[in-house]
Structure formats: structure tokens, C-alpha cells
Amino acid sequence: MSKRKIKEEMLQVIAPEIYGPPKKEEQDYKPRKLKRVKKKKKDDDDDELDDEVELLHATAPRRRVQWKGRRVRRVLRPGTTVVFTPGERSTRTYKRVYDEVYGDEDLLEQANERLGEFAYGKRHKDMLALPLDEGNPTPSLKPVTLQQVLPTLAPSEEKRGLKRESGDLAPTVQLMVPKRQRLEDVLEKMTVEPGLEPEVRVRPIKQVAPGLGVQTVDVQIPTTSSTSIATATEGMETQTSPVASAVADAAVQAAAAAASKTSTEVQTDPWMFRVSAPRRPRRSRKYGTASALLPEYALHPSIAPTPGYRGYTYRPRRRATTRRRTTTGTRRRRRRRQPVLAPISVRRVAREGGRTLVLPTARYHPSIV
């Protein structure tokens, strides 16, 4: 043990290193007391001057954004007489009664050009719409109308000024009719049956610009033309079989006997026969649905194939590699033993429609009940 350690132990017994709280030093100076200065009362003359003029802000508060109001062009209201009379104030502008406004012959032209009574209020924005795609994916049809923009916002949302994502883009609708039919026959003689549902076909997206595409949706509305009705009625009138003629003669005799007993009436309107359009027989499919067919696939060698299903076990082909010949001249072929696959128990499950499925029996872990 060194002498330094012995001295430290002796000092620890005599004067242990335990320190008490520090002593506060006595303040030799007295704290300074602050005196509040009383404001002198202003004279009465100064109060009178202050009451007359009071400047709250020397300069107007500046806005963060330099904003300017819209420039308004003064438009003289129609019907106002411009007369200058010295010493008299100009009267309030006169506005016509709307009964008089509605009587104008060029009312629509005034509203379109924003003239007269239509020259006030918010200026409407001229909407300029450009079609992104004018191609026709159905060559057998011809367009009748232009591409009209469909409103995507409700009227209440437009008034509130709501904006949605991609608000600059809007869908369009266009009416198309068959090329081989005349336009008058299609628009005038065709009737739409409300009970039939239209056939909808969604076409793939066509790219018109980088990052921008157009998707066409074909809605085929089933219609019944009056030409089919006319041909059907003509066919009924020109039937000349002997059975029909005998029935017609009997009907004529019965009508003549009834006419002799009752008053004779003349029919001026032609008879209307409601004949349904002939339905085309639905083509029978030669093949089953594509979802019911399983593709040909290869299984991993570790997977045992299930009987009743397609698929085969993948066997990698041996690559043609050059081997060194042994000096003895004898070759040994190394055959890879194929793993012995255990047979799989299979169960057949009957489904609706007389279909049977071959499913493998599942094997559970011993811990699963």
C-alpha cells in the first residue's frame, strides 16, 4: 500500500469530505425603489383640439398582395334621355320593365351579344371546347351531331364555384346512326322501347398525348323501326292460301249480316297492327366459356400432380457438356434417381348443372382438429 493511500485514509477519518450548504453573502447595499411619475393633466384647450381632429392611422394599412379592382366600363342604360340642364342633378337611370324587354324581336341576339338590359352583372366566360379525339372506332356508323360537352357539376355546385380534379377535361356525347339508312328514316320513324336495356361496350384507352388518354364507351340503344311494321302488315295482307280465303269469305258474310241489322259506320283511319320485330335466334356456342378451360402448365418437381387436372412435372433437360475422358477408357453414367411420389387420394364433388370436380383430399397437421 502506498503512502498516498495511507494519507488519504487518515485524512478521511480526521476531516471527512462532507460539504454543507453554501453560505449566503450578506448584501451591503439596499434595494432601489422605483417611483412612478404621474402624468400632467393637459389643458382644456388641448382637449378641444384633440376632439376635433383625431388621426387613427397616418397611412392606410398595406395589403400583402397588390390587388386592383376590375375595371368597370360605364354603359348607358337603354331608354335614358341624355339631357344637360344647368343647375340640376342628373336623375337616376331608368330601367325598362321586363314586359317591354321581352317584346323585343331581337331579344336572343341582345342576350348573346350582352347588349341593352343584358349588359350588366357578371361577365360570362366564353367556353372554348376542343375535342381530344375525333376518330370513329365504328366505321359502320356515321355521326349525326357534334361532340357535345356533358356537364359534370350540378347547377348548385357551379353557382358555388366548386372545382374538381381535372376540371378542364369534360366528357362528350355524340349520336351516331347506321350508314346504310337514311337520316330521315332513322330520326323520324324509329321508336325507342323503354323496357329494353341498352348494350354498353367499354373500349380500351387511346393515348392522345403524353400522360393523357381518351376512352370511348359505346351505348347501343335498341330501337324498332316502322319499316319492319309495314313489311309485316303487307305480308299479312298478301296471303293467298285457300284456308285464309275461306276464312275471309266467312268473315265478309258475317260482317254483311251484322251491317244489315245495325247502322253502317265508315272507318277513315287505317288499322294499326302491333307487330313485334322478329328476334334473331341466338347463336349456340361451339366452345365452352374461357374461364372453365385450364391452361397447360408445368409443376415444380417437388409438387405431385393431381389426377384429373392438366399439368405435368417439369423435368430439366440435360445440357450437352464436354467431359474429360478417363485414361482407362471406361465411362460411367450417373443416373439421377427419381423421387418416389406417393399417390394422392382424390374425392369427387358434384356441382350444380351436373358438373363434377376432382379435388384432392387435404391432409391436416396433427395439431389441427
Curated annotation (Swiss-Prot):
Induction of the gene: Expressed in the late phase of the viral replicative cycle.
Disordered, as annotated region: 15-50, 307-342
Annotated positions of the Phosphoserine modification: 166
Stored InterPro entries: Adeno_V
Entry GO CC: host cell nucleolus; host cell nucleus; virion component
Molecular function, one GO term: DNA binding
Phosphothreonine, modified sites: 85
Any one GO BP annotation for this protein: viral release from host cell
Subcellular location: Virion; Host nucleus, Host nucleolus
Database matches in Pfam families: Adeno_PV (PF03910)
Subunit field text: Monomer. Homodimer. Exists in equilibrium between monomers and dimers in solution. Interacts with the histone-like nucleoprotein; this interactions bridge the virus core to the capsid. Interacts with core protein X; this interactions bridge the virus core to the capsid. Interacts with the endosome lysis protein VI; this interactions bridge the virus core to the capsid. Interacts with the peripentonal hexons. Interacts with host NPM1; this interaction might play a role in virus assembly.
Role this protein plays: Associates loosely with the viral DNA to form an outer shell around the nucleoprotein-DNA complex and links it with the capsid by binding the endosome lysis protein. Dissociates from the viral genome during entry. Might be involved in nuclear capsid assembly of the viral particles through its association with NPM1/nucleophosmin.
Note from the entry: All late proteins expressed from the major late promoter are produced by alternative splicing and alternative polyadenylation of the same gene giving rise to non-overlapping ORFs. A leader sequence is present in the N-terminus of all these mRNAs and is recognized by the viral shutoff protein to provide expression although conventional translation via ribosome scanning from the cap has been shut off in the host cell.
Protein name from the UniProt record: Core-capsid bridging protein
Native organism: Human adenovirus C serotype 2
